[in-house]
């Protein structure tokens, strides 16, 4: 029965893939000859500094330690590597599994001389040293939960060589040693944490901030097949997680525990074990719910919280119109899809172009779904993406996607996130981080409070806005033009008790990953202005006030919790009514509401589908008393015609390569291509079904 079910799932996946091929090929036949996304024109930007969304965690600007940290201003760093599940902290040996021909070695500490390679915890000490060198405030370490660690560094391990593996135990019944016994063939996790506390201090005293409960445990069976490990079940993962978390808390109660660190939507849904998931799918909508609920129950039983952060890995599975994997391809089609792929995290109107996303569409957009699960099953648990990547680190599309996702993480209340870079050149991704963390080279950064910002529904642009918790007038705004070839004029309207008269401008785009200072915005009148954006460019606007009216913002002391506010102002209701503007509320539909998070809601909407070419819709003035949903900061999809407005800020134009307009293709050619593709898909479906029938008969 298991094989039949597994075969049926394979057939279903193949059919979804075939349908995706057909849909993309027929629906976007012109993509074979030109762009699949069209440039859009003017965009209306509405910002309201008095509508605070949440506190932005400083830890979202993190990175994995697999790249140089010298030229990027990050706030968190973590260990990365597929071999971490088998890392032996006592000797620094690790086995690289099927990805590395099952070689056990000291590769993780290869930068050190041989006489110190066996120093206990050297790999982690190296992480702490780098964090200190580059002034990175938060460090996170991965613990081992698989049950086996490399027992030597002598090369390829063959099946049956049990002596070459050390047993991993979570708790040591004897005293925890300052220096471990490397000859007992056992590696203790509580002793590992104790060793790190002795050398670096408790988390509350500046030591290691948190510990991951292994890394991508759903892949143990495949990655370490020679160990003959059974497929991981949901119950087994929770059991091990609770035991290891208890060990961590017993040694360092102030350290955070993060898990389950599984990767991809399929893992979120069923832990990549559909057969086991049948036992729970009637009770829980996806594995995330099961994990949170059972970790909560384990915490209640133990009298202490055992999971502080719901941690996940996310690597885009999106494919271009030509079915190229976006994460590892930098063609024109992959680049334009990459700049849209971030929307799978928050936008219910977007479907990632992948078989997995289509199969599990009901579990997207991802962040609102995860937050709803947290509220339902384990309230006050934080959310992190300790490994993520949208690719394109060596070109502007990757820089735009990176700038976009950082804005999303801040706006959506993510606690911690670490870019997991791929390739030697990730200069554009690093620049995107630096734009938020040090845009002027003098330490100036995006604010720590997210405020309302909306772009009227334009999928070819994004906007994010912030103020400081101790300075409500310190408005910073990120604007992004995703148009491949066209300039875009942003018509910006700011609703605020502050009057802004100018804005400094910083940007990167085109073929350059350097942040440059542009001409300042000087044409702000009544908190409104027009701003011209070059194609494929990201901007940071630092606003300066003309007159700051008395205002005090009171926030919670916990910088990681959702913000609660009380605004005191001596501005008259008449003045406030004149300054406020209409805003759209798009995200109220995409994110489940919590009664503790919202008291007011607005369902105002603006449709841009009927906008005529060359026409700009005026912003409607409303009274200050208009209710606005706190969660309505989504950047939703729409399209407007291309418009270029003169008199806007002059910025040096950076034209990307391959921007010529595609030649029109005769309809007859398109029809022929459609027919050919349809024929191929039909053959694919026939082959899959035939294979299934034959296999069934053989059974």
Where are the regions that the model predicts?
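Noncatalytic carbohydrate-binding groove/subsite architecture in carbohydrate-active enzymes
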Residues: 188-195, 200, 234-397, 402
């Amino acid at each position: 029965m298991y094989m039949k079910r597994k075969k049926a799932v394979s057939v279903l996946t193949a059919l979804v893939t075939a349908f995706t091929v057909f849909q993309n090929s027929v629906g976007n036949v012109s993509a074979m000859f030109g762009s699949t996304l069209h440039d859009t024109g003017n965009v209306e930007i509405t910002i309201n500094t008095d509508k605070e969304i949440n506190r932005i965690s400083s830890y979202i600007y993190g990175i994995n330690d697999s790249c140089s940290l010298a030229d990027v201003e990050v706030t968190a760093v973590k260990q990365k590597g597929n071999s971490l599940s088998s890392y032996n902290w006592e000797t620094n040996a690790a086995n690289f599994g099927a990805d590395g021909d099952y070689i056990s070695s000291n590769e993780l500490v290869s930068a050190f001389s041989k006489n110190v390679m066996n120093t206990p915890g050297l790999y982690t000490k190296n992480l702490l040293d780098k964090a200190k060198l580059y002034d990175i405030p938060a460090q996170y370490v991965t613990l081992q939960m698989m049950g086996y660690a490399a027992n030597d560094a002598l090369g390829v391990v063959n099946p049956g060589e049990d002596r070459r593996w050390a047993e991993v135990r979570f708790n040591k019944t004897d005293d925890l040693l300052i220096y471990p016994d490397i000859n007992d063939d056992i590696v203790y996790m509580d002793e590992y944490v104790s060793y790190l506390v002795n050398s670096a201090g408790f988390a509350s005293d500046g030591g290691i901030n948190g510990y991951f409960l292994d890394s991508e445990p759903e892949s143990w069976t495949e990655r370490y097949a020679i160990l003959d490990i059974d497929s991981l079940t949901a119950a087994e993962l929770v059991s091990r997680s609770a035991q290891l978390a208890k060990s961590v808390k017993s040694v360092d109660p102030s350290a955070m525990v993060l898990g389950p660190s599984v990767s991809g939507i399929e893992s979120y849904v069923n832990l990549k074990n559909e057969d086991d998931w049948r036992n729970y799918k009637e009770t829980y909508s996806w594995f995330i719910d099961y994990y949170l609920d059972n970790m909560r129950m384990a915490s209640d039983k133990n009298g202490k919280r055992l999971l502080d952060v719901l941690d996940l890995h996310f690597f885009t599975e999106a494919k271009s119109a030509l079915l190229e994997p976006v994460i590892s391809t930098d063609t024109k089609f992959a680049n334009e899809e990459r700049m849209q792929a971030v929307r799978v995290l928050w936008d219910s109107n977007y479907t990632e172009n992948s078989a997995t996303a289509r199969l599990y569409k009901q579990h997207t957009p991802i962040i609102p779904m995860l937050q709803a699960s947290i509220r339902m099953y384990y309230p006050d648990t934080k959310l992190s993406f300790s490994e993520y990547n949208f690719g394109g680190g060596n070109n502007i599309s990757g820089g735009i996607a990176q700038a976009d996702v950082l804005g999303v993480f801040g706006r959506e209340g993510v606690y911690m996130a670490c870019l997991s870079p791929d390739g030697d050149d990730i200069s554009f991704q690093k620049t995107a981080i630096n734009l938020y963390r040090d845009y002027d080279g003098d330490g100036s950064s995006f604010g720590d409070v997210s405020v309302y910002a909306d772009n009227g529904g334009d999928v070819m642009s994004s906007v994010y806005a912030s103020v400081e918790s101790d300075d409500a007038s310190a408005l910073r705004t990120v604007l992004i033009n995703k148009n491949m070839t066209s300039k875009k004029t942003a018509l910006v309207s700011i609703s605020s008790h502050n009057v802004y008269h100018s804005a400094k401008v910083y940007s990167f785009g085109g073929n350059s990953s350097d942040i440059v200072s542009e001409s300042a915005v000087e044409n702000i009148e009544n908190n409104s202005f027009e701003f011209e954006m070059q194609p494929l460019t990201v901007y940071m606007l630092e606003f300066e006030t003309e007159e700051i009216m008395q205002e005090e913002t009171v926030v919670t002391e916990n910088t990681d919790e959702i913000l609660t506010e009380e605004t005191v102002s001596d501005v008259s209701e008449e003045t406030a009514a004149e300054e406020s503007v209409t805003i759209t509320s798009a995200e109220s539909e995409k994110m489940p509401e919590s009664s503790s998070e919202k008291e007011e809601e607005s369902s105002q909407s603006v449709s841009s589908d009927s906008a005529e070419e060359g026409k700009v819709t005026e912003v409607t003035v409303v009274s200050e008393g208009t209710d606005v949903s706190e969660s309505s900061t989504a950047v939703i999809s729409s399209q407007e015609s291309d418009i270029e407005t003169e008199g806007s800020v002059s910025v040096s134009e950076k034209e990307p390569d391959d921007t010529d307009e595609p030649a029109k293709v005769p309809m007859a050619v398109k029809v022929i291509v459609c027919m050919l593709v349809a024929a191929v898909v039909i053959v694919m479906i026939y082959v899959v079904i035939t294979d299934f029938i034959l296999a069934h008969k053989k059974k």
